[in-house]
Amino acid sequence: MNFEKVVERICDFIRGVVSSSGSTGVVLGLSGGVDSATVAYLCVRALGSERVFALIMPETGVTPEQDVEDAINVAESLGMEYKLIEINDIVRVFKEKAGEGSKIAEANLKPRIRMVLNYYHANSMNRLVAGTGNKSELMVGYFTKYGDGGVDFLPIGDLYKTEVFQLAAYLGVPRRIIEKKPSARLWPGQTDEEEMGISYAELDEILKLIEKGERRDDEKFRRVVQMVERSRHKREMPPVARVRDLL
């Protein structure tokens, strides 16, 4: 990877998106993971720290304290303004009013609450919400629809997870963040690779084959293809019933 050119291209993209929208900057959710840290580094490089605002939104009992510490360290080292909002009370009140849901519904509630907080602050500040999703997650639908998928633009959305690790190291993201097991922190002890049943290295290898139109005759390949196909609705605008020809 030509890191210098990749960073230059992404920074130009960030500046262009913000400028064309008439926004004053960006808001992003900073989790303490490698994706959000990488996006923070890129946004600050593109716009300057004064135009990047971070929200750190842990769930006590689920989010490890190290994640919170890492997120704060990233924000402070980059000179970004940030706010820490624990989401436990919001989750509790929501469930009291809406009633108990299934495990997956309650897990997806957390990123959807974080999305609302991102946009609440972005609207108040006339800013855009910077997404932190990578190409691997986008292709297989490993994100919550209208949760962490609810963003205005995706700086690292064309980089596979394994490439994000490389870019993070180039940008100077702390080593302990890069080496951390990727996790959406949907429940205690949850990790991305265990939930998907495949490592990011294996996943990216298969996704690159799919992108090239090549195939492989094994169960893992077929399962990844199925993940891509079943999550198509997450990557597209809602379908519209066409009736104009009847009017």
Curated annotation (Swiss-Prot):
Domain of life, source organism: Archaea
Associated pathway: Cofactor biosynthesis; NAD(+) biosynthesis; NAD(+) from deamido-NAD(+) (ammonia route): step 1/1
Positions of Mg(2+) binding: 35, 137
GO biological process, one term: NAD biosynthetic process
GO MF terms held by the record: ATP binding; glutaminase activity; metal ion binding; NAD+ synthase (glutamine-hydrolyzing) activity; NAD+ synthase activity
Gene Ontology annotations for the cellular component aspect, listed alphabetically: cytoplasm
Keyword Repeat recorded: no
Record bears the keyword ATP-binding: yes
Catalysed reaction equations from the record: deamido-NAD(+) + NH4(+) + ATP = AMP + diphosphate + NAD(+) + H(+)
Residues binding deamido-NAD(+): 112, 145, 152, 233-234
Subunit record text: Homodimer.
PANTHER family, sorted: GLUTAMINE-DEPENDENT NAD(+) SYNTHETASE, NH 3 /GLUTAMINE-DEPENDENT NAD + SYNTHETASE
Annotated family: Belongs to the NAD synthetase family.
Role of this protein: Catalyzes the ATP-dependent amidation of deamido-NAD to form NAD. Uses ammonia as a nitrogen source.
Name of the molecule in the record: NH(3)-dependent NAD(+) synthetase
Lineage of origin: Archaea, Methanobacteriati, Methanobacteriota, Archaeoglobi, Archaeoglobales
Gene expressing this chain: nadE
